[in-house]
């Protein structure tokens, strides 16, 4: 357990120390750093459903376990995400929103932590298209690794997009605070942001594909859907999966 106090703004170190001592010293004593425990996931894959009868939309989350934030594949994983679902023109959003019209938006992201992270893709879709949407997600996952391997143009566009976004990380007081928090929380090198664009630029297709082969494994997939179970289960677009109803565990009726 470790506590960080990150302050940005028109102030001084002396002022921060004065008020932080008053606010926290009596409540919190200095403690040694304790590393995050090694967490063992349930047996994978996992397919869960929460039943909301009458829901006009289904919320879909599809996830994969991944490595810690400081893993050497971080930059390749970041570029992979940008291609797969990290931007408006990404593959998954283009498929489900623009081509199929199932959703207003479908995206992907990493939730990073010290030892174990999770890669997720998700959004809300019309209830009647729940299983069809899952089929398209499965298709995009498999094609990324086989018949539609990213080519140079797609790779370069993804990297350019990430680099173009970079200045926005410094545009406000709160965004600078987020940067400092990120460095502290993940124990990053102090020059991490100075080298970020260069490290993104160096990512190769081979590195992205190595991440894809390790990350996008159907055998380790985790799916959670929240919607009208009756409509979803009566859908003719079937995948070879059986959902576990966890409604009672999370919804009080």
Place the predicted regions along the sequence by residue.
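Charge-rich, well-structured scaffold segments of protease-associated domains
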Residues: 1-32, 99-100, 104-253
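His/Glu-based metal-binding/catalytic segments typifying zinc-dependent metallopeptidases
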Residues: 32-89, 252-253
């Amino acid at each position: 357990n470790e506590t960080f106090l990150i302050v940005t703004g028109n102030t001084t170190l002396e002022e921060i120390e004065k008020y932080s001592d008053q606010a926290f010293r009596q409540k919190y004593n200095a403690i040694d750093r304790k590393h995050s425990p090694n967490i063992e996931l349930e047996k994978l894959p996992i397919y869960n459903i929460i039943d909301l009868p009458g829901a006009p939309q289904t919320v879909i989350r599809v996830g994969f376990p991944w490595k810690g934030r400081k893993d050497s594949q971080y930059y390749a994983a970041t570029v992979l995400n940008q291609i797969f679902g990290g931007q408006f023109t990404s593959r998954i959003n283009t498929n489900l929103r623009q081509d199929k019209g199932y959703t207003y938006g479908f995206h992907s992201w990493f939730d990073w932590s010290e030892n174990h992270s999770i890669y997720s893709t998700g959004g809300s879709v019309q209830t009647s298209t729940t299983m069809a949407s899952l089929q398209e997600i499965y298709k995009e996952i498999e094609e990324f690794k086989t018949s539609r391997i990213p080519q140079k143009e797609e790779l370069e566009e993804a990297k350019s997009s990430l680099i173009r976004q970079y200045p926005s990380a410094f545009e406000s007081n709160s965004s600078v605070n987020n940067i400092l928090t990120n460095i502290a929380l993940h124990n990053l090198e102090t020059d991490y942001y100075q080298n970020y664009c260069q490290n993104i630029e160096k990512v190769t297709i081979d590195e992205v594909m190595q991440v894809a082969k390790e990350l996008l494994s159907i055998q380790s997939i985790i799916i959670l859907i929240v919607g009208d179970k009756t409509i979803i289960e009566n859908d003719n677009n079937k995948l070879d999966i059986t959902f576990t109803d966890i409604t009672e565990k999370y919804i009080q009726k």
